[in-house]
Amino acid sequence: MIRAIVFDLDNTLTDFMKMKEAAIRGAIDAMIDAGFALPREQLRERVRTIYDERGLEFQNVFDELLEREFGEVDPKILAAGIVGYRRARESELVLYPHAQLVLLELLKRGIRLGVVSDAPRLQVWMRLCALGLQHVFDAVVTFDDTGERKPAAAPFREVLRRLDVGPHEAIMIGDWAERDVVGGKSLGMTTVFARYGDTFDTKVSGADHDIDDLLELIGIIDRIHGASPGSAKPTEG
């Protein structure tokens, strides 16, 4: 009996990489307009280099960019970059198709919902609030809550504890096989690979099920509960 579903957030419920790229483009255009005299592609490469070094959640990327280029922070260019980034981010931060429908159906069935993310706590909650999901989840576990990243057991154990369910009563769904699938499986959770959000061209996920649309999750639950097979696609091989 499945009593809880645990979601990864980025590239599982929302297309994080699409949003990030759009936000970076918005920031670059705004900084150039404010007087940053570098070609657009060159500026984009410098921003990507900082993210590669510091991680995609690094919050002072434009400060560091300006310090590297000019030895100091130009407040006008910095402000333009931040505003441009936020405007583009807000317009591009949307749920994947059928995500809202699936979440509502799960709530209607009385299934408890959780999130496990490697992102910092504030960033996770900002994204959930922007998506209108701040009241949907019974448990939200971020990197700050355990100090460990997936596939370590701690984040998964913590979300199961907060949801008050055992691992065999929960499904873990995520787009990163080496983290979401491996971590969930290690505790005995049923695992679902969100192939639609995969950015690594994963050939074999190792999950119990691969899906190309969130709507297929309902079919998986129905099959586990002995109802109809729905549209679930078991992992091949």
Predicted regions and their residues:
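N-terminal helical cap/lid subdomain that shapes the substrate entry/recognition surface
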Residues: 2-104, 122
